[in-house]
Amino acid sequence: MEKLSDISSCIILSGTGGLGKSMMMRHLFLDATKRHTNTGIIPFFIQLKNYRANFADLIDFIIFEISSLFSGISRERMIAILESGKGLFLFDGLDEISQETAVSFQSALDAFINLYTNNQFIISSRPYGNFSAFTRFTVVNLESFSKAQSLELIDKLDFRSDMPEIKSKFRKELDLRLYWSHHGFSDNPLLLTIMLMTFEEFAEVPSKMHIFYQEAYTVLSKKHDANKGG
């Protein structure tokens, strides 16, 4: 998170393949939550596929989206967070907004940031033809690792030195099949690490991506809860 905030307070994470970007955004959310005691930053994970132009403004949409996690949060409380400059807003899936509402969202987001400039804003998206409309955002392209680079990362990773067989078995699976069967995760440094954590927890990486995605998020949540409890 620190590396991203060093680049800009307004960032677009651009890359192909939907699962990897959403998982990365969830990781940023959980990581910021874990660090809240030290930083004071309050993260909000917002799925843009649910955006509609009939919301009064972006604050109303955000409150609607986060109501399941932040039950009963008021508009006044949200404005107080925004005015403090302690908000991290993770907007997931810009490319999932319908063409009919895209202009409305761009306008609402621009007004939102103009009012509350001191917060942090991260948007994830597939490569999108209209990034040029987001003039204040810095586009960060998610670069893919080659198979050799992914294997090298696993070799260098300090992971469970008490049980080296976990990493060794995962590396073998990565070399034989996982790099290609789970492309989009296996070629991304952060997501590859999450794959290894999932392998440690479940002793395998499921071939069906929706099951793997659920298990990976379960592992992230457990790690977050363990750190929170400690």
What function would you assign to each model-found segment?
Residues 1-229:
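P-loop NTPase signaling cores
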